[in-house]
């Protein structure tokens, strides 16, 4: 206990800067013969994505020239952002002959209009830059994800969001008034077409481009409709989760920026009471989220080794004890929020929107030889995880929460793996006019949990409980998966859940009739060809399939395909203890002559 708390304190003494993340694109010869990955160093299927070359345009004119050349040559094209935080294979081209277009240097402000409260930026601008540029004009982006390392193009491509039911909701794309898109063209167009999209010019094209998965072309520029600067008043409160099902339905109507951190094995919820207040309200608060700060690589390696030890030994007691220490520590330091940028003196914490909405100081760039880094940097022994994220309709949230509670009642230690990553983050979203945006008011559940870095066939402690939650959400509660997160199975048949999918596909056909910006992966998730699931030995362990056979799990290690415990239609990899040569399931069938 003393060692663990000392280690946490050691990590708490974080640094002002860290080694910046590596470029996700690596090439053997100049900008040719390349591979691309994401910021975590692995896709859900652990495949290596290759491309013939990568291009780094610095202006829209250069971007237009690159798209024209690729179209003329009939090459597949995908867009790569500065850090590539999407977990699925959204950046991969098919085969080895495609072209990657990086927006790394498309990172400039194009124009401002303080009177109209608009800001136009290139698509490679990061959320951090966007927030800062808006603040210079005394304007604010009202909602955004909590991690500021995403780019404008990445935000738009995957439908990234914050947390709110108020106004237009929490999705960044719903605060966009205009998009410039560069797409393939006909020979008569010079093989390229630049479109200016807005609600007034062509609503269907604009609504398709708001969340496009990169299949319509390259976003060149985006114009944001901002709001006058305001402040926020934030208080975190931890309570037991006895009435959480009821609270979850109504809490978002009471607080504009409400969210939750649910610790189901501990029976606790952290409520975020977060409201807009006038800009002249006293307070200089700053939210520098602790897990997004630079961390000592040696400390991260020790923490990861402890986690690996818990998994290999099957020791849920240690996992639960450490999870409680981590969550208690983070709550005790208010997750990194301070009243004056230096210290936390008490709630409420009041600060300007640009200081309270997003953070990510581990991106601050000074090369230090990886002495410090972002916790998930694949070059070190640090965090490596699955991330399952989905939106449950608000009208059905109480039932979903109660189902999870029922699982915890069966085995209280089963979800400590989620709490070791600070619990289930739950954010409010609302319906969006974007064709691939959210369909209705909902709560977005974000589950982060251990993944073996070296062995895709390694089962996880109590993995059947998390798999059951995943399948329960997707199949029983008709949840919408987050486009930029998730394992393959979450996208099985997903396009059928969007009422405007056919209209989106018509726009796609108009923008890119040859499918140069489409890939095998995008065709699968859009329901055009094939299926995202991959059926093979051990496929269910990493969410590549839903098991239908013991071989899809890890039978040699005692993990067999079994029905869910609460959602019995689920098929999950369960650790089965054998007695007298038969597991419990087989003994049951023998008793009733079922085999």
Curated annotation (Swiss-Prot):
Name used for this protein in its record: Probable L-gulonolactone oxidase 1
EC code(s) of this entry: 1.1.3.8
Alphabetized GO MF terms: D-arabinono-1,4-lactone oxidase activity; FAD binding; L-gulonolactone oxidase activity
Domain FAD-binding PCMH-type residue range list: 47-229
Gene: GULLO1
Organism: Arabidopsis thaliana
InterPro entries xrefs: ALO_C, FAD-bd_PCMH, FAD-bd_PCMH-like_sf, FAD-bd_PCMH_sub1, FAD-bd_PCMH_sub2, FAD-linked_Oxidoreductases_BP, GULLO2-like_C, GULO_Plant
Reaction(s) catalysed by this chain's protein: L-gulono-1,4-lactone + O2 = L-ascorbate + H2O2 + H(+)
Function noted in UniProt: May be involved in the biosynthesis of ascorbic acid.
Cofactor(s) needed: FAD
Domain of life: Eukaryota
Pathway participation: Cofactor biosynthesis; L-ascorbate biosynthesis
């Amino acid at each position: 206990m003393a060692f663990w708390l000392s280690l946490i304190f050691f990590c708490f003494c974080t640094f002002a800067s860290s080694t910046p993340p590596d470029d996700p694109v690596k090439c053997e010869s100049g900008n040719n013969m390349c591979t691309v990955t994401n910021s975590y160093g692995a896709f859900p299927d652990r495949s290596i994505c290759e491309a013939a070359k990568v291009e780094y345009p610095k202006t829209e004119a250069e971007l237009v020239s690159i798209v024209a050349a690729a179209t003329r040559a009939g090459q597949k094209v995908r867009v790569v952002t500065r850090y590539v935080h999407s977990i699925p294979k959204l950046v991969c081209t098919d085969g080895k002959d495609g072209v990657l277009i990086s927006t790394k240097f498309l990172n400039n402000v194009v124009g401002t209009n303080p009177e109209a409260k608009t800001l136009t930026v290139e698509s490679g601008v990061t959320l951090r830059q966007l927030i800062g540029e808006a603040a210079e004009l005394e304007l604010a982006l009202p909602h955004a994800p909590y991690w500021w390392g995403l780019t404008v193009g990445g935000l738009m491509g995957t439908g990234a969001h914050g947390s709110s039911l108020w106004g237009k909701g929490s999705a960044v794309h719903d605060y966009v008034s205009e998009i410039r898109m560069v797409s393939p063209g006909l020979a008569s167009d010079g093989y390229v077409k630049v479109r200016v999209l807005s609600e007034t010019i062509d609503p269907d094209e604009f609504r398709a481009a708001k969340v496009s998965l990169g299949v319509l072309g390259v976003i060149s520029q985006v114009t944001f409709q901002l709001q006058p600067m305001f402040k926020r008043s934030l208080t975190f409160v931890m309570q037991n989760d006895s009435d959480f099902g009821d609270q979850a339905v109504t809490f978002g109507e009471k607080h504009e920026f409400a969210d939750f951190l649910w610790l189901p094995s501990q029976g606790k919820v952290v409520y975020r009471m977060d409201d807009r207040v006038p800009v002249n309200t006293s307070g200089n608060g700053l939210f520098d989220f602790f897990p997004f700060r630079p961390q000592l690589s040696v400390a991260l390696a020790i923490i990861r080794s402890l986690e690996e030890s818990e998994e290999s030994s099957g020791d849920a007691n240690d996992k639960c004890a450490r999870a409680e220490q981590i969550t208690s520590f983070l709550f005790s330091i208010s997750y990194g929020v301070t009243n004056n940028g230096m210290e936390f003196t008490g709630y409420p914490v009041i600060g300007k929107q640009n200081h309270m909405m997003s953070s990510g100081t581990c991106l601050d760039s000074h090369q230090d030889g990886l002495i410090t880094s972002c916790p998930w940097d694949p070059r070190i022994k640090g965090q490596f995880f699955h991330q399952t994220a989905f939106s449950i309709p608000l009208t059905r949230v109480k039932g979903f929460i109660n189902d999870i509670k029922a699982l915890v009642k069966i085995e209280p230690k089963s979800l400590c793996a989620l709490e070791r990553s600070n619990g289930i983050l739950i954010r409010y979203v609302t319906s969006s006019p974007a064709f691939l945006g959210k369909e209705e008011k909902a709560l977005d559940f974000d589950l982060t949990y251990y993944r073996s870095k070296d062995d895709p066939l390694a089962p996880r402690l109590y993995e059947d409980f998390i798999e059951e939650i995943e399948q329960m959400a997707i199949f029983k509660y008709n949840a919408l998966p987050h486009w930029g997160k998730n394992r393959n199975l979450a996208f099985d048949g997903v396009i059928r859940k969007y009422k405007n999918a056919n209209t989106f596909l018509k726009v796609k056909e108009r923008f890119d009739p040859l499918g140069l910006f489409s890939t095998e992966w995008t065709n699968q998730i859009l329901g055009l060809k094939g299926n995202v699931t991959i059926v093979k030995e051990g496929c269910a362990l990493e969410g590549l399939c839903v098991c239908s056979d013991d071989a899809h799990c890890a039978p040699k290690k005692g993990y067999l395909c079994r029905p869910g415990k609460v959602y019995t239609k689920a098929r999950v990899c369960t650790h089965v203890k054998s007695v007298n040569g038969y597991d419990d399931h087989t003994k049951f069938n023998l008793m009733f002559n079922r085999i």
